């Protein structure tokens, strides 16, 4: 007998050699029916996995993130089975689960039409009704290649696997797919499925490879859950910054400018300017000094920093190393430049910490499949910064950085919408990370200890660190349910040594400083996208590009309308007047659609009494009030940065 420690701490004795599913059955038939996968000794495993020793075990149902992934992963295989039934000539690529659903990539003669998606969805339902058993089996490499010989993408995936790696397959009826799992025991639990859309996607995300047809879908154990999700999806579409941002005149794109290069229109530029001025003032108030550094540098700088070895594919390189005496690259980050500034003068321990901040224009060579609106772009503006400090100052400086981030998130009204992720290295991925296991473990332990001291509730993620050190990622879930990293705080153990950075300690000795890479608000473009979605375009008054709109009832009151505009502008309010010869009702409706916080109607009575008739986004029609009172009110609201 072996001892199984369950999630609630209870211990169950079972025979060795049982599968996770059989252990679930021994606990409860209901639990077994709803089981999607298991977490065995901290690792997600298939329900078919055999347990031979004392272990900790959590049975995951659809209510857990791990369970949802196994559930949707199974649904992706049902989709692939449906495609092979209806379109046997199409070739299989990959079909993972993703947040809130799944996708599968196929090599097709032409993209799937809406009618074909409907037929595939019906075929999936037919397969689910047949309820074939899902079987898992393993094969040696030569037999696996023979089995998949007619599926070129699967052959490539098998050849990519390292020697000795387990090569496993899952079979649904007569459909077989290469897959590591985990999967459900059967397809019957999938009670509701919906194919959402078909798009193009490059094989392995590489633009040099063939464009495949990617089909997105979602699946649930109850139809009511699918209905609720689809309803939420419709609401999300209304809030999507890519749609709203264009409708509200915040940004646009142009195919001649290029993908991933959004054009901020006057309203968008005003919003960014407002946020930028606020952040720069706040950073200076907290002891940061501003820098202004070049947009590019010689490859030599990036070779010292390690970006050339670990990040070159993500950079825009100008020139050819084999032909040109000097090769430059547009900067993907600011750190090497601020290190050069630090090294330009000598520093005593009394000078530390040094806190550099810069509003940096950065460039990253994102692939076309990764770019989205303002969230993933090729040129962006980052509130970047680096703190150079002694080991004794590290925890306080990290805490102060977290305090700044929390203040920014609270002021933006999104503090309750963020989560924290402690991102660590993967010791097996030496191409991505500086290969210094001792330094990694030491720095990760330091960061974990600091996070625990700060009582930060965080999750941990492997293989998500920067190449030079672990990081705390501040995550925000967008309207489509996908988590985006909006801010990172990183502890760097490597670059101070690479750049020869030092300070003189109290004994006159040279010592290596610690470096904290940080941002206060993240990438301004991504933050703007997040705010548009959070507020459905109705940005708080202090952020809104147009804070008040003055509407004269007719041309007779144009002079007074202009007088109101001038007084508001004099007090720093962003205001416009609408002098078009349109009916007042039409102009009010349009101003409301533009999410204008305050609409001020002026006519004969208002002009005579020096008043404005106020309609606020928050309270609706408020009636007439003295102009001076309204000006003081909106100025105070803006100054307090009310949400």
Curated annotation (Swiss-Prot):
Annotated GO biological process: threonyl-tRNA aminoacylation
Superkingdom of origin: Bacteria
Gene3D superfamilies per the UniProt record, alphabetical: 3.10.20.30, Anticodon-binding domain, Bira Bifunctional Protein, Domain 2, Threonyl-trna Synthetase, Chain A, domain 2
Disulfide bonds: none
Annotated cofactor note: Binds 1 zinc ion per subunit.
Domain (TGS) ranges: 1-61
Keywords, in A-Z order: Aminoacyl-tRNA synthetase, ATP-binding, Cytoplasm, Ligase, Metal-binding, Nucleotide-binding, Protein biosynthesis, RNA-binding, tRNA-binding, Zinc
Cofactor(s) the record lists: Zn(2+)
Family: Belongs to the class-II aminoacyl-tRNA synthetase family.
Protein name as annotated: Threonine--tRNA ligase
Organism: Clostridium perfringens (strain 13 / Type A)
Lineage summary: Bacteria, Bacillati, Bacillota, Clostridia, Eubacteriales
